[in-house]
Amino acid sequence: MLTLNYIDPIAFELGPISVRWYGIIIAAGILLGYFIAQASVKKIGYDQDTLVDIIFWSAIFGFIVARIYFVIFQWPYYIQNPIEIPMIWHGGIAIHGGLIGGFVTGIIICKQKNINPFQIGDVIAPSMILGQGIGRWGNFMNHEAHGGPISRSVLENLHIPNFIIDNMYIDGKYYQPTFLYESLWDILGFVILILLRKHLRVGDTFCLYLIWYSIGRFFVEGMRTDSLMLTSDIRVAQLMSIILILIGVIIMIIRRVKYRSPRYKDVGPLSWPNPKVK
């Protein structure tokens, strides 16, 4: 008889409070991303408090908007179960909502502090995509965000570790570990952004982040069974991915042709807005 090593979504309990792996992993991704960004921001010459403010407030409002975004597209359920709306520890946050909330918050702080949002975006972009890659393991622990049914033999032929295969056995069926596909794509994106950043112009790394992440998300989303749907045929995440790819490409072209942005490695802190460099 096959024995499955099933992981409990609850890491430990503190009295009446159940602490889930989901929250621990999300927090770990944010912290690791912060330390990586901290090393980058030192090289440019920004004050450390600036980075703390941007990451802290962007994370806070990012989570809030991510939850609101998710609830809006699942409104028929939450109108019947309003008490569950704040229960983010059960899962149910949408990364695209988080990106919207985080980006808007970051831009506001950059404006207030008179610093260049594209330069800060270049600093934070590798940390963001790494954090997203780590965060997908929170979905794994919650046994969510998976693909359609698949046989165990197919998963074994993909040389996926047994502990992952075992935990893809949900309600009597094995499922595609789409969390893993997206996580690996994001981690590869982190490596690429780190290696290329010093050779790119200010703003390019952030734009490449939008493009790289969105390409991967578009294809992975097509395999998922729990997608937020705009209509019966249109997945919200795929539509948002297309929009972000276009935004990334357009901004990169405009900043290269119209503004001739300086190279990332050649400048110190830039003010808002980015000065033209011929």
Curated annotation (Swiss-Prot):
Summary of the function given for this chain in its UniProt record: Catalyzes the transfer of the diacylglyceryl group from phosphatidylglycerol to the sulfhydryl group of the N-terminal cysteine of a prolipoprotein, the first step in the formation of mature lipoproteins.
PROSITE patterns tied to this protein: LGT (PS01311)
- Lineage, top ranks: Bacteria, Bacillati, Bacillota, Bacilli, Bacillales
Species of origin reads: Staphylococcus xylosus
Protein name, entry field: Phosphatidylglycerol--prolipoprotein diacylglyceryl transferase
Question: Could you tell me the gene encoding this protein?
Answer: lgt
Instruction: Tell me the route in metabolism or biology where this protein functions.
Output: Protein modification; lipoprotein biosynthesis (diacylglyceryl transfer)
Q: Which UniProt keywords apply?
A: Cell membrane, Membrane, Transferase, Transmembrane, Transmembrane helix
Where does the protein end up?
Cell membrane
Give the E.C. number(s). Answer: 2.5.1.145
Q: Which family does it belong to?
A: Belongs to the Lgt family.
Q: Can you tell me which residues bind a 1,2-diacyl-sn-glycero-3-phospho-(1'-sn-glycerol)? A: 136
The entry's cellular-component GO terms read: plasma membrane
